[in-house]
Amino acid sequence: MDRAAVAKMGAVASASVCALVGGVVLAQYIFTMKKKTGRKTKIIEMMPEFQKKTVHIKDPGRVEEIICGLIKGGAAKLQIITDFDMTLSRFSYNGKRCPTCHNIIDNSKLITEECRKKLLQLKETYYAIEIDPALTIEEKYPYMVEWYNKSHALLIEQGLQKDKLAEVVRESDVMLKEGYENFFDKLSEHNIPVFIFSAGIGDILEEVIHQAGVYHSNVKVVSNFMDFDENGILKGFKGELIHVYNKHDGALKNTEYFKQLKDNSNIILLGDSQGDLSMADGVANVEHILKIGYLNDKVDELLEKYMDSYDIVLVKDESLEVANSILQKIL
C-alpha cells in the first residue's frame, strides 16, 4: 500500500474517531442539559430535604442558580423576609387546624360566646374568598379590608386587656413549624436580619416568638399592633391596616428599614399566599431572591399558580427543613 493510501486511511480513521468522540461529548452535553432541565440539579441532589414529596420546583436550574448566588454572597449579603401565620407557624398538627394570631384571640376566654360566633361567621365568609382560585388579588382586596375591619371592631368592643395576652398565647394551640429553633438561632448567630411581615396581630405574634425563646435582636416585626389606653384596655389598632393582599404597599412604607440593609442584596422570602410575593418590593437593590411558598389548602386548584410564582413550593409541609438546609449551605 503506497503512502497516499495509508494517509487516506489514516485520515478516515481519524475522522471516525473524532466523530465518535464528538458524539460522546454531544451525548454527554445533552444528558447534562436534560438533567439540568429535569427535577434535580447538582446542589439539590446533595440536599435530602429537597427529595421529599412535599417539595415542588418548576425550574430546578433557576433554583440552583439562585442558591449558588446566595452561597457565594454568604452571611454578609443575606436577609430574610417572611410571613408569619401558616408560614413560620403551623397550619395543622395531627389533622387539627392550628390557630393564626387572630384565631388565638378569637378562641380565647377573653371573648364572649356571642362575639366568637360573629368572628367565626366572618372567617367562614371571607376565608373562602381569600383562597378562591377563581378571583384575582384585585377582586379579593376590598373583601379582605372588610373582613379585617369588622373583626377588629368586634375585638375593640370586647375591651381586651393587654396584661392577659401572654396567658392567652400560653393557653392556645399555636405551634411554630418543626425546625424553628434551628432557623431562628442560626440566623441570630450570624446576625442575619429577619423581617417578619404579618397581616396578623403584632402583639400576639411577638408573644408567640418570645415564649418560644426565639425573639432575638436581629428580628423586626411589622404587623397590626393593638393600641391600648392608659388602663391597658384595647381602644384600636395602630397605623394603617395590613392585610394579606396589601403587603406591596406595606413593603414600600418600610423602605427606610431596607435602605439600612443596602448591602444585604440577597433575600430568602417565605410566604403562604400570593400576597406574600410582594413583601420584598421595598428592597431596591435585589441581587438574588429565592421565594419559598407554603401551599396549605386547595392544593389541586392552586399548585400550578404557586409553582408559577414561587421558586420552591412546599405542599402541606409543617417544617422549616428546606429553608434550614439552604441556610446550612450559606452560613
Curated annotation (Swiss-Prot):
GO terms for biological process: CMP catabolic process. Its main location: cytoplasm. Belongs to the pyrimidine 5'-nucleotidase family. Pfam families: UMPH-1. It catalyses: N(7)-methyl-GMP + H2O = N(7)-methylguanosine + phosphate; a ribonucleoside 5'-phosphate + H2O = a ribonucleoside + phosphate. Its EC number is 3.1.3.5, 3.1.3.91. Mg(2+) binds at D83, D85, D272. The active site is at D83, D85. It comes from Gallus gallus (Chicken). This is Cytosolic 5'-nucleotidase 3A. Substrate binds at S198, A199, K247. Nucleotidase which shows specific activity towards cytidine monophosphate (CMP) and 7-methylguanosine monophosphate (m(7)GMP). CMP seems to be the preferred substrate. CDD domains: HAD_5NT (cd07504). CMP binds at E130. N(7)-methyl-GMP binds at E130, S151. InterPro entries: HAD-like_sf, HAD_sf, Pyrimidine_nucleotidase_eu. Induction: By norepinephrine/NE and adenosine which are released by the embryo under hypoxic conditions. By stimulation of beta-adrenergic/adenosine receptors in definitive red blood cells (RBC). GO terms for cellular component: cytoplasm; cytosol; endoplasmic reticulum; nuclear body. It is found in: Cytoplasm. SUPFAM superfamilies: HAD-like. GO terms for molecular function: 5'-nucleotidase activity; magnesium ion binding; nucleotide binding; transferase activity. Keywords: Cytoplasm, Hydrolase, Magnesium, Metal-binding, Nucleotide metabolism, Nucleotide-binding, Transferase.
